[in-house]
Design a protein with these regions (language model features):
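A detector of repeated loop/turn-to-beta-strand junctions in beta-rich toroidal repeat architectures
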Residues: 26, 82-85, 125, 139, ...
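A short loop-to-beta-strand structural motif that recurs across blades of beta-propeller domains
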Residues: 28-30, 86-89, 127-129, 174-176
Length: 227
């Protein structure tokens, strides 16, 4: 029997959940009902079988946003600063389609509940990016809000009441608040300087792999990946 490897989970307004399948070679989004029934929700888009799929978000209008980090397999080939084959899928009343492509390891994305803009972390491009969303759901006016530095690999995100964006950074085990003007403040940190240095050297040499992510741990916290 097929069992998804859920990486992202979203609650549906009418009950149930959407799960992203982050398989070794396959992806997609699956719907899980409260009684335990699992059915495919999205397995192909624009003629493409969904690669291993990272994240799913249901916005305030009921639109569904899905991220794929990389088309490369194995996925750790995408752990490169120059890799830009990640994309974002929108599922709405018009169907499913890719609305942004060429992203640097697309991770969590959220639509801001007040501004209606979409924010997305590009983990191995090490930046937080924002798009305006048109009435038809197209993503336009791509803006880099901030770029991250040594040991910082943005993964999860959420918003606060002052239009700040809270970001989790794997490897450095940080929670970083990014203000509206792009300034940054470290809120939480539990990191190992030796591990950061080892990982940074591999990243700069295009040799970053799973071992650099899986071994990361602070004194009290393991990898902080989501909020």
């Amino acid at each position: 029997d097929f069992r998804p490897r859920p990486n992202g989970i979203a609650i549906l307004p009418d009950g149930g959940w959407l799960l992203t399948h982050l398989g070794d070679t396959e992806g997609g989004v699956f719907r899980l009902t409260p009684d335990g029934e699992l059915t495919p929700f999205l397995t192909r888009v624009d003629g493409l079988d969904m690669p291993p799929t990272n994240y799913v978000h249901v916005d305030g209008q009921g639109r569904i946003w899905v991220t794929v980090s990389t088309r490369l397999q194995p996925r750790d080939l995408g752990y490169r600063s120059r890799c830009s084959d990640g994309f974002i899928v929108l599922v709405d009343d018009a169907g499913a389609r890719i609305v942004a492509d060429g992203l640097g390891y697309t991770n969590e994305c959220l639509v801001h509940p007040e501004t209606g803009q979409l924010y997305v972390n590009e983990t191995f491009a090490r930046r937080l990016t924002r798009f305006d969303v048109t009435v038809d759901g197209d993503l336009v006016r791509k803006t880099i809000i901030t770029e991250f530095g040594e040991g910082e690999y943005p993964d999860g995100l959420t918003f606060d009441s002052e239009h700040g964006v809270w970001i989790t950074s794997i490897v450095s085990n940080r929670v970083i608040r990014v203000a509206r003007d792009g300034s940054r403040e470290i809120i939480v940190e539990d990191s190992d300087p030796d591990h950061i240095a080892w990982t940074e050297a591999a990243y700069l040499a295009d040799q970053l792999g799973r071992q650099h992510l899986d071994k990361a741990a602070g004194k009290k916290l393991k990898n902080i990946s989501s909020l």
